[in-house]
Design a protein with these regions (language model features):
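Conserved flavin/dinucleotide-binding core of flavoenzymes
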Residues: 2-12, 335-470
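Mid-domain catalytic core of redox enzymes
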Residues: 12, 242-354, 358-368, 372, ...
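N-terminal Rossmann-like FAD-binding beta1-loop-alpha1 element of flavoenzymes
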Residues: 15-40
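Conserved Rossmann-like nucleotide-cofactor binding loop
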Residues: 25, 46, 279
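Glycine-rich FAD pyrophosphate-binding loop
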Residues: 34-56
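A short alpha-helix-loop-beta-strand transition element characteristic
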Residues: 53, 76-97, 176-183, 298-301, ...
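Dinucleotide-binding Rossmann-like beta1-alpha1 core, especially the glycine-rich loop
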Residues: 59-145, 155-157
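Active-site/ligand-binding neighborhood in enzyme catalytic cores
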Residues: 134, 138-247, 251-255
Length: 470
């Protein structure tokens, strides 16, 4: 662990900033403050939070978040700084597997007429689809950041968009086959249509339909490479296996009680950035204003259970050109082809990488099963959708995310002022502050870091280059 700075010890603190959590929010904050005297405490034995992947030769197995933004995104700047590379996803990202058929090409507006649906189901699909398109366009408008606008203003608009009704209520009564399709897509955010706002549901589709909003790239080598590389550059300033049990703000410093391998120790800092899930922040940070504590406690998280599958095909396969398929009625609600980003002109390497996950109610059911039972259920349904996979499976990894995604529930906008308020020397960061994704988490972490930097500058704290370390 990096020793405290002599200059900061003279000021009665060990560090300028303690960052709690080494997910992408915490690491983005640490990267922003890499010239300052900082320390990052992460309770797990690895960095990255919900960004988990495992390398497998030419491929990788993804077990968590995997969608990166384009060149104007904050994630893209972090990727560039880390010397890594993302590539645009070439395949269809809105496929559907319904009643034994797959439709994964062409305009989504044609799907109701190409899927094996009854006339009543087709009509229901068209009516609900038109309502969804209208709401998605509204989401696209309000989600765009205006010139000179604070990120907090965008967050307030996004969480407030159509948050007075549920997604299910907005779509209205649907044919059962159509309801199952929208349920599968809603479960992508780990909740059911009646649990999320109409705006949250619209946002799921807006991010797929709008190229300016879409997170439509994959990190070459797997998502975990980004947090791993940032942590490697930050070196001993990132401490894993370090569980922060208490954060106590005081007038001129913040005390942090952390459990390390040698026992519980206390550290202090000018600022603490709590880059932890909302419920963890609520548990560890003391003396929060009552409305902020209540808001953190009321952020709902849904589960998902993920399966990553390494395949061993020797040549091209029918799904090479497809990236994502929604799979209503299966043990999982989404199927991804993470080798799709590698498919294009030139030689196709043998093998492949698939990922499935079940969120929302599907995730809750899966959490009650053993890993072996989950694997059997996943493979059975993969074979029913992609029969050619049978006999090609080389490895399966199951991962459980009990608190996966902080979905937007009705009335969410009423919590936002309490989450955005200034809390003195404690700063909040995380994807729960807006529509949950990696970009939001990274932006929130960097924003918190810049606020801490401004505070340190006002206090006249020296730069890292001006310090003499013991």
């Amino acid at each position: 662990m990096l020793p405290p700075s002599a200059n900061d010890m003279d000021r009665g603190v060990d560090y300028e900033v303690v960052i709690v959590g080494a997910g992408i929010a915490g690491l983005a904050a640490a990267w922003e403050l890499r010239d300052r005297n900082i320390i990052v405490f992460e309770s797990a034995d690895r960095v990255g939070g919900r960004m988990r992947s495992e390398p497998r030769g030419h491929y990788w197995l993804n077990l968590g978040a995997h969608l990166f933004g384009g060149p104007d995104s904050h994630l893209a700047r972090l990727v560039d700084a880390a010397g890594l590379e993302t590539k645009a996803i070439p395949g269809n990202r809105m496929g559907l597997a319904v009643n034994g058929a797959i439709v994964a090409s062409g305009a989504p507006e044609t799907y109701p007429f190409r899927l094996p649906l009854s006339p009543a189901a087709r009509l229901s699909f068209v009516k609900s689809g038109l309502r969804l398109r209208w709401a998605a366009r509204g989401f696209q408008r309000i989600a765009r950041r205006r010139t000179g606008e604070l990120a907090s203003a965008v967050r307030a608009r996004v969480v407030g968009y159509r948050d007075d009704e549920t997604f299910a209520g907005y779509l209205g009564a649907m044919h059962p086959d159509v309801a199952s399709i929208f349920r599968a897509v809603a479960e992508r955010i780990t909740a059911e249509p009646h649990e999320i706002t109409a705006g949250c549901g619209a946002g799921l589709f807006a991010l797929l339909w709008d190229s300016k909003l879409t997170m439509a790239r994959n990190l070459m080598g797997g998502s975990a490479l980004l947090p791993q590389t940032l942590a490697r550059h930050l070196s001993e300033r990132v401490v894993t296996g370090a569980t922060v049990e208490e954060v106590v703000p005081e007038a001129t410093r913040v005390r942090v009680r952390v459990r390390l391998s040698g026992g519980v120790e206390e550290r202090s800092a000018r600022y603490v950035i709590a880059a932890t899930p909302a419920h963890v922040t609520h548990r560890i940070v003391r003396n929060l204003p009552a409305d902020t504590a209540a808001a953190l406690a009321h952020i709902p998280y849904g589960p998902f259970v993920c399966g990553a599958i390494l395949t061993g095909e020797s040549g091209p396969m029918p799904w090479d050109g497809v990236y994502a398929i929604a799979t209503p009625g299966k043990a999982f609600n989404m199927l991804f082809n993470h080798a799709n980003v590698l498919r294009g002109p030139g030689r196709r390497e043998p093998g492949g990488s698939l990922m499935v996950y079940g969120g929302g109610d599907s995730g809750i059911r899966l959490l009650q099963m053993t890993d072996a039972q989950i694997q059997d259920a996943f493979l059975r349904d993969i074979y029913s959708i992609l029969p050619a996979v049978k006999g090609l499976v080389r490895e399966v990894i199951v991962h459980r995310w009990e608190y996966a995604i902080p979905y937007i529930a009705p009335g969410r906008s009423r919590l936002q002022p309490a989450l955005e308020r200034l809390l003195g020397n404690v700063l909040l960061a995380g994807d729960y502050l807006e529509f949950p994704d990696m970009e939001i988490a990274a932006v929130a972490g960097s924003e918190a870091a810049r606020m801490a930097r401004r505070g340190l500058t006002r206090e006249g704290a020296p730069l890292a280059s001006e310090r003499v370390r013991p």
